[in-house]
């Protein structure tokens, strides 16, 4: 029988399929980011660089200079920053501190501050939580509050493989942050548990400008169920 924790490796050709599907943001910061080592990270980055005019790829880096930059994409005149963080990379350790963005409170605050200076809206892709659990754990709630206090507009969570709640979290400056703790799986279910029944959580929202400030409004939450 197979043993050990699974290592993932996906053909680079799938990138074109994701672009054709309509994705324009991709987060490389997750617990499998180093499954294929530094070469895998390099391949990942160079694959998405081919689509840089269509997709903003973030979360893993080949240099400190690239790591310091705030990833921003302009959509219909709105500058959207995407910050990405993961709880870890399983048993794999990066050669450099800048390779993968992991959860660090001080760095998050610095990143968000820079992002707010350079963009209109700040999104965070957070790879966190416990697999198969429908409720956020204490660490997720802790960082959701950190994101809100820093002024993040929207947090999109991944990793649990099942849908978790969507909440507004109040920040210390009177702002509100929309937090989707876990969107479930977009394409594949799992072989155990009820993941295959909770295929995808979808959030629709509008970004509007009021009094020179951009706001997240008209939030609609939908969960799509996979037929069995």
Predicted regions span which residues?
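Acidic, metal/ion-coordinating pockets
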Residues: 1-227
């Amino acid at each position: 029988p197979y043993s050990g924790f699974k290592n993932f490796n996906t053909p680079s050709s799938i990138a074109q399929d994701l672009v054709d599907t309509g994705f324009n943001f991709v987060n490389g910061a997750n617990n499998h980011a180093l499954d294929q080592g530094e070469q895998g990270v390099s391949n990942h980055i160079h694959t998405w660089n081919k689509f840089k005019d269509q997709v903003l790829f973030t979360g893993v880096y080949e240099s400190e200079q690239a790591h310091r930059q705030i990833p921003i994409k302009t959509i219909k005149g709105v500058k959207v920053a995407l910050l990405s963080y993961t709880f870890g990379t399983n048993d794999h350790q990066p050669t450099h501190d800048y390779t993968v963005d992991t959860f660090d409170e001080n760095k998050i605050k610095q990143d968000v501050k820079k992002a707010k200076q350079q963009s209109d809206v700040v999104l965070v892709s957070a790879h966190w939580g416990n697999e198969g659990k429908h409720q956020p754990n204490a660490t997720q709630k802790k960082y959701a509050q950190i994101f809100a206090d820093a002024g993040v507009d929207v947090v999109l969570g991944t990793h649990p493989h099942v849908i978790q709640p969507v909440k507004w979290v109040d920040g210390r400056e009177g702002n509100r942050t929309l937090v989707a703790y876990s969107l479930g799986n977009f394409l594949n279910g799992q072989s155990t548990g009820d993941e295959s029944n909770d295929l995808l959580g979808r959030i629709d929202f509008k970004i509007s400008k009021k009094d020179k400030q951009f706001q997240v409004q008209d939030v609609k939450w939908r969960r799509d169920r996979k037929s069995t």
